[in-house]
Structure formats: structure tokens, C-alpha cells
Amino acid sequence: KSAVNLLAKYNNIVVTRSFSKIYALAGIRVGYGLASADIVSEFDKIRQPFNVNYIAQKMAVASLEDGKYLKRSLELNDSGMEFLKLELNELGISYLNTYTNFITIHLGPRTQKVYEILLSEGVILRSLENYGLPSYLRVTIGTKEENNMFIKKLKKSLKELK
């Protein structure tokens, strides 16, 4: 899903894009925004002259030009998301619908314990307690093997808590 089409209708929005997730370039800390000429002009007034280093710029441009990588990444993310949703539905675990590379799952009062068990099993996920959502965990969509491992260890942790 994209909000880019809203730019033609509204002149007071900025659509931001990151290279962190789908392009797997989180370490270079680069992104861009799409907006009306008026908004871009205002940003130019406060923008630092050298806010993104040369290497990061080159990596970002190369990423945009590599359509095959983007297509494959989207396919892997979509199939991984579909798999996780099917498994979570089977387990009776609710989740928030998303168009990102992660899924937010709701585990209720057992969230912290499941989180601790999964961490001890080598599954790295994010607790959303610091964001005011103590009964939710954020799970990044991984490879097929990683997703299978997550579900296997999630099932194991839920059994331990029964």
C-alpha cells in the first residue's frame, strides 16, 4: 500500500521512504521524502548541506535501480507474512494487520513470559511495552527457515506456560 497517490490530491503531506527494511540497508540510515514543491522548499531552508554521506547515497541509488532485488524481497515478505498469519490463526493468536516487514502479535497477560522464553531460545523480537502496548510483541518477517523456527519456538513457549 502506498500514499504516493495522495500527493496529487493534497499539498500538505509528506510521504517518507526508508531503505532500512525492504532494501535491508538499516545501517546506512538513509531515506527520502516525497512532497509538494512548497513543502520541499521549506525543508531546504533547514536541511544540513551534507546530511547524507556519499557512500550511503550511492547505496540508496543502487538499491532503487535493482528492481529484481526489490521484487524478490517483496515476494519473500508476502509469503512469510502469509505463513505467519496462518500459523497465528491456528494458534488463536490475534495480530494487527500490516503492510510492513513485521507483524504485531497480541499475547495478553502471558506476553512478558513468552518474550523472555523466546529470547532465551535465541529468538529476537521486540517487546512493545515501552510504547504503551505491554501485551504485544513485534515479530520481523524472516526467511522461511527463520519463520518456521519462530513458530516452533512460540508453540513450545506456549506449552511451557500451560
Feature annotation, model-predicted:
Residues 117-121, 130-162:
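PLP-dependent enzyme catalytic core of the Aspartate aminotransferase-like
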Residues 78, 87-121, 137:
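Conserved PLP-binding catalytic core of the aspartate aminotransferase-like
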Residues 1-4, 23:
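Conserved PLP phosphate-binding loop immediately N-terminal to the Schiff-base lysine helix
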Residues 12-89, 93-96:
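PLP-dependent aminotransferase class I/II
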Residues 5-9, 13:
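Nucleotide-activated donor-binding/catalytic signature segment of Leloir-type glycosyltransferases, i.e.
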Residues 27, 99-100, 132-135:
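Short acidic/glycine-enriched loop/turn segments that link adjacent beta-strands
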Residues 34, 104-106, 140-142:
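Short hydrophobic/aromatic beta-strand micro-patches
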